[in-house]
Amino acid sequence: MNFDVVIIGGGLAGLTCGIALQTQGKQCVIINNGQAAIDFSSGSLDLLGQLPSGRQIQHFEQNYTALYQQAAQHPYALVGKDKVIEKARQFEQLAQTLNLGLVGTCDKNHFRVTPLGGLRPTWLSPNSVPIVTNEEMFPHRKIAVLGIEGYHDFQPQLLAENLVQHAQFAHCEVTTGYLNIPELDHLRHQSREFRSVNIAQLLEHKLAFSDLVREIREAVNGASAVFLPACFGLETQEFFSALKQATQLELFELPTLPPSLLGMRQHKQLTQHFKQLGGLMMNGDKVIAADVHHQRVTQVYTQLHQEIPIQAKDVVLASGSFFSKGLVAEFEKIREPIFALDLVENDRFNLQDRMTWTHSRFSAPQPYQQTGVVIDEHCRARKSGQFFENLYAIGNIVGGFNGIELGCGSGVAIVTALVAAEQIGGEK
């Protein structure tokens, strides 16, 4: 099997890179094993939420120098400010083209409401999610937060109590309630199955829609805005939009405990577009080995096609971090399992000293979360001190940052994906 580009990993980074390359006329295959982190995400995409010093930021461009000074190994520091902004804006255009329904701009962060009633800075959010800026008040004075009876992954009272602590919601009257939805009685008797995905599947196929509309309208107690758990609409936002139109209320949905319908919808849309452009998905398979000759990967072998190598001019590693097994931690070492690539170290994290991998305080940023593959400004991966000519690393497999701490995981995935795609597309 021969392709222009083999992409290892089908998450946000892999799909974004694949779409960009297919648009340039490259023939790509994505080798994907299992679910990606995007399936468990909030649906909002972060560019940079705070600096390593802990200071929350609003404007990326104004704070880039501080990021560079505090985290010189960060992928943004390697790529450069202008390139990061260019690629962020490129993705904003792509999101519009694909009708992803995202709002926001890389010029300034906004705040999304979290399931616990907090406010988290972010770059792009689904248009169905409640958002505010630092300066504005939420436009609705009366808010109803409605859960679903027996569904424990969304707590209306806790959300309501925390929400009014923020200046943007201090003027709001927030009430809480629960929807019964009799069609869900079967799931209520099986608590393990009472999750957002199962609820959405059941509602789309067996729901008396008019009864749900009536129940919501009766539960809001005169509120003009309604916050609901993201359990309405499995693969698209069409069901939720229809519900909003039928109730004639400003309905908003909030992400629940994983898996997240908001992230799964995005994954579905990106995958469909990649396929529509002519890309091939090899699902349920994984790369286990590769042939390398003079700093070039010539072919890769997968678990299901060990006797049939897959050849490509370029290879993109988008296999994720520990969660997706793109990185593997053993008792005495952390390694990248396919190519044995060099991993990022610093004065606080030593691959040879396990005691430096973690912080004694559980809630503190953990040093091991910053490790990952060493790349250059073009996202080429390094092994034994030398950079490959045609192997690129993108997304959470890349080292030098803690996406949870800094609020930049999605941004790094998107920016590195588009930088690698540009580099590959420009090759002769």
Swiss-Prot record:
Catalytic activity: a quinone + sn-glycerol 3-phosphate = dihydroxyacetone phosphate + a quinol
Gene3D superfamilies registered for this protein in UniProt: FAD/NAD(P)-binding domain
UniProt EC number: 1.1.5.3
Cofactor: FMN
GO CC terms: glycerol-3-phosphate dehydrogenase (FAD) complex
Major enzyme class: oxidoreductase
Any one of the GO BP annotations: glycerol catabolic process
A GO MF label: glycerol-3-phosphate dehydrogenase (quinone) activity
Subunit-level organization: Composed of a catalytic GlpA/B dimer and of membrane bound GlpC.
Similarity remark: Belongs to the anaerobic G-3-P dehydrogenase subunit B family.
Function description: Conversion of glycerol 3-phosphate to dihydroxyacetone. Uses fumarate or nitrate as electron acceptor.
Protein name in UniProt: Anaerobic glycerol-3-phosphate dehydrogenase subunit B
Gene, per the UniProt record: glpB
